[in-house]
């Protein structure tokens, strides 16, 4: 999910090995890696889709922040910048991957459901504070700093409302408009004014359980 970074990381470790024992240590370390979980693959697919569809810029791969394998980081699944003409704004989003045949699927409901999470991203200042700090630390001193500065200025001048939110549902089932119809209607009263909200359902032709093998084969 972060091929260039992982390749450089592995090459750097290999260059540090000066003895057979060191080489064995590095080999064991690299072999201890795990296959990405389905929800991690889903988040990666969502990032690619939003980049292709909207030109969203991702300044940092969040997988690099994991201290525990498979851990889901707090705050938001998607954190980046949306460019709209000459304007730049923060984009925060959540991703759900589901094989549930129900319509809507269960991943949309409850406190961990997609709609509640989008509601939180729209209105929880404490979450915005955490995400802005996280972004600033990863945009300072590089090519993303001007994007951060412009998006932060827009956020402040709009009292925290001029942002973009994305809710992405990834399915391996048949297309069903009911998956998001009622959820979209429920969000109308939650997000008002200049805030932009986008809900997308993407229906992939291969089973969720096959995604890992497909990615591994494509990378070979």
What is each model feature region?
Residues 188-220:
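Charge-rich, low-complexity intrinsically disordered segments
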Residues 103-177:
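Acidic, metal/cofactor-coordinating or nucleic-acid-engaging core segments within structured domains
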Residues 177-191:
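Short, aromatic/basic amphipathic alpha-helical patches
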Residues 1-44:
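Interdomain/boundary linker segments immediately adjacent to catalytic/signaling cores
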Residues 50, 78-80, 90-97:
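Conserved catalytic cores of phosphodiester-cleaving nucleases, focusing on short active-site segments
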Residues 95-105:
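Short beta-strand-loop-alpha-helix junction that forms the active-site gateway
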Residues 44-53:
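Amphipathic alpha-helical segments that form well-ordered structural scaffolds
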Residues 53-71:
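A short acidic/basic microdomain associated with nuclease active sites
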């Amino acid at each position: 999910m972060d091929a260039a970074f992982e390749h450089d990381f592995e090459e750097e470790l290999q260059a540090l090995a000066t003895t057979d024992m060191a080489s064995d240590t590095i080999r064991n370390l690299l072999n201890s890696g795990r296959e990405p979980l389905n929800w991690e693959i889903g988040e990666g697919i969502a990032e690619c889709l939003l980049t292709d569809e909207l030109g969203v810029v991702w300044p940092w791969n969040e997988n690099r922040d994991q201290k525990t394998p498979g851990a889901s980081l707090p705050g938001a699944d998607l954190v980046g910048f949306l460019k709209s003409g000459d304007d730049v704004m923060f984009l925060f989003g959540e991703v759900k991957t589901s094989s549930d045949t129900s319509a809507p699927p269960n991943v949309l409901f409850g406190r961990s459901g997609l709609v509640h999470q989008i509601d939180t991203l729209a209105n929880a200042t404490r979450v915005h504070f955490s995400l802005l700090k996280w972004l600033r630390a990863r945009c300072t001193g590089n090519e993303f700093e001007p994007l951060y500065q412009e998006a932060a200025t827009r956020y402040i001048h709009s009292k925290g409302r001029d942002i973009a939110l994305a809710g992405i549902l990834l399915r391996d089932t048949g297309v069903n408009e009911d998956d998001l119809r009622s959820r979209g209607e429920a969000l109308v009263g939650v997000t008002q004014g200049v805030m932009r909200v986008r809900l997308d359902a993407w229906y992939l032709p291969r089973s969720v359980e096959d995604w890992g093998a497909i990615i591994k084969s494509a990378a070979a």
